[in-house]
A protein has these predicted regions:
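Intrinsic low-complexity, repeat-rich intrinsically disordered segments enriched
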Residues: 1-38
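Residue-level detector of functional hotspots within protein domains
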Residues: 29, 40, 98-100
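Short carbohydrate-recognition loop motifs
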Residues: 39-45
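Acidic, glycine/polar-enriched metal-coordinating patches/loops
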Residues: 46-132
Length: 132
């Protein structure tokens, strides 16, 4: 194994994990949801107020234009909320150009994933599932 070139070749994983961070209720976090990719890759929050976007920080970039991603579990609080799908100052791109609507039903979970192939300058959004 030689990690001086930042490459692992022909690796077989027996187990695979991603770090999880429970962000708690969103109302206490301000208007943008803070996503710190140095702490986790999977996040959970309960939207208890309107969210004007995601503030993604510490996007890993080793200069090799590697892809990076994260997932969000949104838990409904029983009240319809507005979600603006901006990441930083740029709107996430969704299939068909249509952003999803957040499920507000009490304790129902929506899962969304985001992928960037340019170090976090632009993001593609994916619906992993809704109304779980």
């Amino acid at each position: 194994m030689n990690l001086q070139d930042n490459t692992l070749s022909r690796v077989e994983f027996l187990d695979y994990f991603e770090r999880f961070s429970d962000l708690g209720d969103f109302a206490s976090k301000g208007t943008q949801l803070a996503i710190d990719l140095s702490t986790a890759q999977v996040f959970r929050t309960k939207l208890t107020t309107t969210c004007t976007g995601l503030n993604v920080t510490n996007t890993p970039d080793n200069g090799n234009a590697n892809a990076v991603g994260f997932s969000l579990f949104f838990v409904g609080d029983g009240t319809a909320r507005t979600m603006t799908w901006n990441i930083g100052s740029t709107a996430a791109s969704w299939a068909g150009g249509v952003a999803p609507t957040y499920t507000s039903t009490l304790n129902k979970i929506d899962v969304f994933s985001f992928l960037s192939r340019d170090g976090g300058s632009t993001w593609l959004g994916f619906v992993g599932g809704q109304n779980f």
